[in-house]
Amino acid sequence: MVEDGAEELEDLVHFSVSELPSRGYGVMEEIRRQGKLCDVTLKIGDHKFSAHRIVLAASIPYFHAMFTNDMMECKQDEIVMQGMDPSALEALINFAYNGNLAIDQQNVQSLLMGASFLQLQSIKDACCTFLRERLHPKNCLGVRQFAETMMCAVLYDAANSFIHQHFVEVSMSEEFLALPLEDVLELVSRDELNVKSEEQVFEAALAWVRYDREQRGPYLPELLSNIRLPLCRPQFLSDRVQQDDLVRCCHKCRDLVDEAKDYHLMPERRPHLPAFRTRPRCCTSIAGLIYAVGGLNSAGDSLNVVEVFDPIANCWERCRPMTTARSRVGVAVVNGLLYAIGGYDGQLRLSTVEAYNPETDTWTRVGSMNSKRSAMGTVVLDGQIYVCGGYDGNSSLSSVETYSPETDKWTVVTSMSSNRSAAGVTVFEGRIYVSGGHDGLQIFSSVEHYNHHTATWHPAAGMLNKRCRHGAASLGSKMFVCGGYDGSGFLSIAEMYSSVADQWCLIVPMHTRRSRVSLVASCGRLYAVGGYDGQSNLSSVEMYDPETDCWTFMAPMACHEGGVGVGCIPLLTI
């Protein structure tokens, strides 16, 4: 009964002690250490561990299923555990009580195996993270094998990527020399190996054979057939490969060396060689610094500004500007140098070229193209720069030129089948693919690719959407295009191409409509840089992760507002 003048109180009050569950687990842990109230014993060999069923069932899925589903063990006072390390089981029982676990190099594998058996996914993930963060050329092959055995897909992929990135160092390890033939064959055949030259792959394979010459000598022909000997220097083939005693005494090996030498001596025979043996390797999982070159400001003026993006730190930093302002510029990276090619300076289309050395932070003029051009596609294949199409101030171009850094000369090669300006151009599976673009009258969805061995162009499946001023890049076994302009609107849509199916399919669109966008691959992801959304130039950047099929905004450019050329210089030094 409430008296007159007294404050009316609610009939229901909720009271709680938030720390009670965690405090209760601590008390139960202490009781277990005293050996009191325990109702089950887990046995491994001569080791026995007492515990409480209720705690094990609450914390460990394996025991939850055992004790709540009327399994035979739920009535046993002592349960025999098979296939686990005793110290790992003890650590996981302690974890069930206090939520703490110490992971180190000595126990990580046994803990991961135990966690997998007991269905403790969070601990399994923590162990995988521990191993992934400590990958090294001396242990990565063993970690990969362990990850495969334990069906840890993320760790397996991380170890695989590490092996590809650090192949030269890995090939010098004891783990590599102890690999079975099947694993070595699989490894030396990978496109993703990060090597400065194919000669490093040859030396790795030969070292593996010589480690057990008597047993492995007969495997050399099979190994050499999976190495891209035609991509070795002629001098190396003659002075090193051909002179090796293991090669000289094997007829099949000598035939492979002759085939490689013919590649250099008789170019007309190149189309008849197995395609994979003449396809350069490309390690797309390496992190690289992304350079944004030239472009436009908000007033539409061409810029000479250059800035560099670190995708790991997610930050931009300004570096030395070019000697010439260039928008719609072609950008290529060869031998650690960044080339700015052609473009538009605000008054004229340019044929001039300059190269940036990041080690000295300097720009140097190099040989000019034969034609003035802006809005062309620029790629690198077999150490040569190719520029495709573009606009010379009067019309769209079909012409193609290639530049040799060794001779500092440009050479005209076979023209495309169509005049194409603002097309997407990328190297994919050893061929130059040109997608979309326009000829001044119409915008294309068509695609063609160039075989540099035969100097011929061939059609490929057209994109689902016609587009020009879009970004194009390859990543792994797929080719991607994004953004652009279709004649009526600015695009955010993106597509992916598979050469096996010769077919395009849509992927998730970007968050922003982007015409004049540049697309570049780094560290296994794609970066869409800048562009124009129909109202203003863009400084924003989006990153696409093919594993999640998601675009994520990254740090925006600091000094640019769209229309930039981009190039990526790998961070990893071989």
Curated annotation (Swiss-Prot):
Keyword Repeat found: yes
Protein name: Kelch-like protein 18
Residue ranges of domain BACK in the record: 140-242
Quaternary structure (record): Interacts with AURKA. Interacts (via BTB domain) with CUL3. Interacts (via kelch repeats) with UNC119.
InterPro entries xrefs: BACK, BTB-kelch_protein, BTB/POZ_dom, Kelch-typ_b-propeller, Kelch_1, KLHL18_BTB/POZ, SKP1/BTB/POZ_sf
Pathway(s) of this molecule: Protein modification; protein ubiquitination
Kelch repeat ranges per the UniProt record: 289-336, 337-383, 384-430, 432-477, 479-524, 525-571
Gene Ontology terms describing biological process: cell division; positive regulation of mitotic cell cycle phase transition; proteasome-mediated ubiquitin-dependent protein catabolic process; protein ubiquitination
